[in-house]
């Protein structure tokens, strides 16, 4: 609904008798008793169609590039797409075909990506194509097909459709367990704790440990067709950095501008709390839309903590019973439902698509026991724990190799995929280096207590083998042109070399010899 006086967008989230509880997506300053409101008859919706790539939106899908001034003015909205642009349409179906919601009618070329024009997701049941436009140039508002439903009623279809952000798009045949490795070029992810196409992961860590840099590295380098960045409640300077940096970046896979396959949805921390909550749902809905085209979509949300804070704010204002740290009692269900929208799907026509979701969590004071981290840990299959101690020692990315994990390593489907595409011994080697890292940490603590001379030389060898793994495989320079992205073949080569060195027997007389030898070895890499 919206106020008639200022056209402010808002949504009814609860009603009791004659009273409606309304979530306002903008500042409520100046609102007064007696203001008239008008219901529009639908939930908060996004407009889906060709022309979304390369755009910068806010949480309500306003095109920020069309807005003037430094700040967003209340009640000012812009249409998210270009009404006048002509698109080269090619039909993929024919007159007489039976179709359902989500089926492909045709395609247009959007930034060198085939953008499928689909039967609107809101259509229920089976339809017959009565007429379909021939190949040619059309605007998004022109009728490109007329469908007949089971009752004989004709329905017109254009290139655009609308969908409520709080509902998942489920126009697919099945949603199996994901198993294909998503290559990111980041060694501590691909080698040690891999994520898959259609997988979920989260990156918790205190401020200053490199969450945003790691997210940017993944979004630049991941083998995804579409990248969506949801800056939810970020500081304004970080959002500006995204806006200025991404248009300049080159996609390492295609050599074209990275922005051509990217959508940015920005909600800074000084924007209204309710809009912050809407931004992650808007991003996920757009991601599901592109998944329905058979594309691999990567969605990065920074940070889901601020989204949860928005949920807490609204829960408090609704006077609901508070849970731990005043978060809503149903926080775990809200987080689980949102993460469940990601996934790998088989479409009705046999094609596959995926939404891979990686969110960051900013726990207050780096406390990983707080409710948002705990509830996210239950549903996300990958956990990349950023550690202040590693960041202070400049060991970036500061992902703790012992606390972090990937549940996908336990999936038989993933193990079979890795054995066929990389090596049958890959997972065994990964588990071995994790064990060596844990043993190295235990010995490091003993050396700190007893001193270098207080432990046997063999212990120093075990410790320095774990340091070799740390320096060679785990640490990576995100700002170096070569080291920033490591292809999978090179990761396999490095892992095999390091494991071979770890298996070798060494004879040293003093701990100083051990240190000198392994330092030289690390420098060679």
In which residue ranges do the predicted regions lie?
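Short, solvent-exposed secondary-structure boundary/capping segments
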Residues: 18-24, 47, 63-70, 116-118, ...
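P-loop NTPase nucleotide-binding/switch module
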Residues: 67-103, 107-110, 116-122, 139-199, ...
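P-loop NTPase catalytic core
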Residues: 191-192, 198-521
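A structural micro-motif recognizing beta-strand termini
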Residues: 16, 22-28, 41-42, 58-60, ...
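Short aromatic-glycine motifs in intrinsically disordered, low-complexity regions
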Residues: 41-49, 117, 182-183
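Conserved hydrophobic positions within beta-strands
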Residues: 10, 56, 104, 128-129
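Single conserved hydrophobic/aromatic residue that forms the stacking wall/gate
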Residues: 2-9, 13
């Amino acid at each position: 609904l919206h106020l008639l006086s200022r056209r402010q967008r808002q949504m009814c989230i609860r009603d009791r008798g004659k009273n409606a509880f309304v979530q306002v997506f903008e500042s409520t300053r100046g609102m007064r008793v007696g203001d008239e409101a008008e219901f529009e008859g639908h939930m908060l919706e996004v407009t889906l169609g060709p022309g979304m790539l390369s755009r910068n939106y806010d949480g309500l899908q306003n095109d920020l590039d069309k807005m003037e001034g430094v700040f967003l003015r209340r009640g000012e909205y812009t249409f998210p797409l270009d009404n006048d642009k002509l698109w080269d349409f090619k039909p993929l179906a024919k007159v007489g075909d039976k179709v359902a919601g989500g089926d492909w009618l045709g395609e247009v070329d959007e930034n060198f990506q085939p953008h499928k024009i689909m039967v609107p997701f809101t259509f229920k049941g089976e339809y017959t194509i009565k007429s379909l436009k021939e190949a040619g140039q059309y605007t998004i508002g022109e009728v490109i097909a007329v469908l007949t439903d089971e009752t004989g009623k004709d329905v017109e279809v254009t290139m655009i459709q609308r969908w409520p952000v709080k509902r998942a798009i489920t126009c697919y045949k099945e949603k199996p367990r994901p198993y294909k490795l998503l290559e990111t070029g980041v060694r501590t992810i691909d080698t040690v704790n891999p994520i898959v196409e259609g997988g979920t992961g989260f990156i918790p860590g205190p401020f200053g440990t490199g969450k945003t840099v790691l997210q940017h590295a993944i979004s630049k380098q991941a083998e995804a067709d579409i990248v969506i960045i949801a800056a939810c409640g970020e500081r304004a300077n970080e959002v500006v950095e995204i806006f200025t940096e991404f248009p300049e970046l080159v996609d390492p896979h295609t050599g074209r501008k990275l922005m051509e396959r990217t959508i940015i949805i920005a909600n800074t921390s000084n924007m209204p709390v309710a809009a912050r909550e809407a931004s992650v749902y808007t991003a996920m809905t757009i991601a599901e839309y592109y998944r329905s085209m058979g594309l691999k979509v990567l969605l990065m949300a920074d940070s889901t903590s601020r989204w949860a804070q928005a949920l807490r704010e609204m829960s408090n204002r609704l006077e609901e019973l508070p849970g731990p740290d005043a978060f809503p009692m149903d926080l775990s269900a809200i987080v689980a439902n949102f993460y469940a929208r990601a996934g790998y799907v088989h479409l009705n026509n046999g094609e596959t698509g995926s939404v891979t979701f990686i969110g960051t969590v900013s726990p207050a004071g780096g406390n990983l026991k707080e409710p948002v981290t705990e509830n996210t840990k239950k549903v996300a299959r990958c956990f990349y724990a950023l550690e202040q101690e590693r960041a202070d020692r400049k060991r970036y990315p500061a992902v703790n190799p012992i606390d972090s994990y990937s549940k996908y390593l336990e999936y038989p489907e993933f193990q079979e995929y890795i054995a066929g595409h990389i090596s049958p011994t890959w997972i065994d080697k990964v588990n071995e280096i994790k064990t060596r890292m844990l043993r190295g940490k235990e010995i490091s603590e003993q050396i700190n207590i007893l001193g270098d001379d207080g432990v046997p030389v063999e212990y120093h060898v075990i410790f320095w083998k774990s340091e070799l793994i740390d320096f060679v495989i785990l640490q990576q320079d995100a700002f170096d042109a070569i080291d920033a992205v490591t292809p999978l073949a090179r990761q396999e080569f490095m892992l095999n070399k390091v494991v071979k060195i770890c298996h070798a027997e060494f004879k040293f007389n003093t701990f100083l010899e051990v240190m000198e030898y392994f330092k030289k070895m690390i420098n060679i890499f």
